[in-house]
Amino acid sequence: DRQTDRQSLIKLLQYVFGYAVVKLSDIATITRGGNFQKKDFCEEGVPCIHYGQIYTYYGTSASKTITMITQTAADKSKFAEPNDIIMAVTSENIEDVCKCVAWTGKNKIAVSGHTAILHHNQNAKYLSYYFHTSMFFSQKQKYAHGTKVIEVTPDKLNDVIIPLPSIAEQNRIVDILNRFDILCNDIVDGLPAEIEQRQKQYEYYRDKLLSF
């Protein structure tokens, strides 16, 4: 079928050129998150990620959640599967809209509203790192709308362009960025200027690794 032909073409381009330039819709199915609220949080229940936590707590990936919701709320919720990307699609500013986290836990989790869930079969951390680059930033600026509340709809996300190397190359890039990420974020002591410089170096090399 058409989708199988598209996947075969992507693999051929990856083999010949080392990567393929694809639309997000070529490699991912995008759905909206659920509708639970903070009042549904509880001590023991179903693990969840609320869209506000993507801005304030989570980094590029997570294997555990910091909150749970009641079973009643979960029964009406939407879920992210292991390896999915959870993206916050509304924000008060352009910098935070489309901030995302790769879910690397072993079980599915409930996801709140104001999110998009990206289901795919790529390296989730590779995609998450890409969604933090300046290349993606320029694209989301084009697709974002609103003034007080900025939004990028799942339909618009389908048109986002991504450079996609083979899974083996994605894994290699992720391994490098993971080590760089740890190096930057594990600094306990040091002058603020040094930490800021290290962060700039990390962002520079991340963008270089993810541009083809």
Predicted regions: what they are:
Residues 108-114, 145-166:
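A short glycine-rich beta-alpha junction/loop motif
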Residues 19-24, 46, 80, 84-86, ...:
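Short, structured motif recognition centered on aromatic/hydrophobic residues
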